[in-house]
A protein has these predicted regions:
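Short, surface-exposed beta-strand/loop micro-motifs that present aromatic residues
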Residues: 194-201
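Condensing-enzyme catalytic core mediating Claisen C-C bond formation in acyl metabolism
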Residues: 186
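N-terminal beta1-alpha1 cap of cysteine-dependent amidohydrolase-like domains
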Residues: 1-107, 117-119, 125, 129-162, ...
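Hydrophobic, aromatic-enriched interface-forming segments
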Residues: 113-115
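Beta-strand-turn-beta hairpins that frame and shape the catalytic cleft
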Residues: 183, 201-205
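Conserved G/P- and acidic residue-centered "switch" motifs that form tight phosphate/ATP-binding loops
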Residues: 110
Length: 219
């Protein structure tokens, strides 16, 4: 049986002068359970390699991780901006350029929704405390597979077809979409107004702020 090849972007770790790249197993296992063939995509600044990576893919998941550097969306870092990696940011933006040219499906998860929004010229709250309104606890201390708050889903969205008008999700983020990128629409929000899912109006590009891969074995 031919399985669609699904690319998974990586995290970085530099410990004891031994740089590493890694990905949580939940992403790999979720793709396999869904019938795909997961491929881990290492971060590189080599354009030919990035283009070759894009050519082999039938789909792309832009995974979670550390914060997107605010320089990417033309802002200075504020006091609660977390760790970031320009190497990863620039790599993912170059990869997205090639993948979008192929018009293959893209799914962004957590940091992934933020990167997609920034790539398409949106902006982020560098910390949820800057929203200037009361917000839910979005950095849960529960196990990753357990839900912590409800989202409300738009009826004309991709999520509504599988989840209905509301769902319980997990939550592990301190940043969120501020200005939505052009040509995207909001698919879901939490009760405090934080954007929890988006989709492109013309292309197969979808993204969620929560971590479905961490819950997929349980629900």
């Amino acid at each position: 049986m031919n399985r669609p090849v699904i690319g998974l972007t990586c995290n970085e770790l530099d410990k004891e002068n031994l740089p590493k790249q890694f990905i949580n197993e939940a992403y790999i296992n979720s793709v396999i359970r869904a019938g795909g063939c997961p491929i881990i995509l290492p971060i590189t600044n080599d354009f030919d390699t990035i283009q070759a990576q894009a050519k082999m893919l039938d789909g792309l998941i832009v995974t979670g991780g550390i914060d997107v550097n605010p320089m990417i969306y033309n802002e200075n870092p504020e006091s609660l901006q977390g760790d970031s990696s320009l190497d990863r940011d620039y790599y993912e933006m170059r990869l997205l350029k090639y993948v979008c040219q192929k018009q293959i499906p893209i799914l962004g998860i957590c940091r992934g929704i933020q990167m997609l929004n920034v790539y398409f010229k949106g902006s982020l709250y560098q910390d949820l405390s800057y929203c200037k309104r009361s917000v839910l606890k979005h950095a849960q201390q529960e196990k990753r597979e357990n839900p912590s708050h409800k989202i409300h889903i738009e009826k004309d969205s991709f999520l509504y077809k599988s989840l209905g008008d509301e769902a319980m999700v997990n939550s592990f983020h301190h940043q969120a979409i501020k200005d939505l990128a052009p040509n995207f629409k909001v698919s879901a929000k939490s009760s405090d107004g934080i954007i929890e899912a988006i989709e492109h109006e013309s292309f197969p590009i979808y993204a969620v702020q929560f971590h479905p891969e961490a819950m997929s074995h349980k629900y």
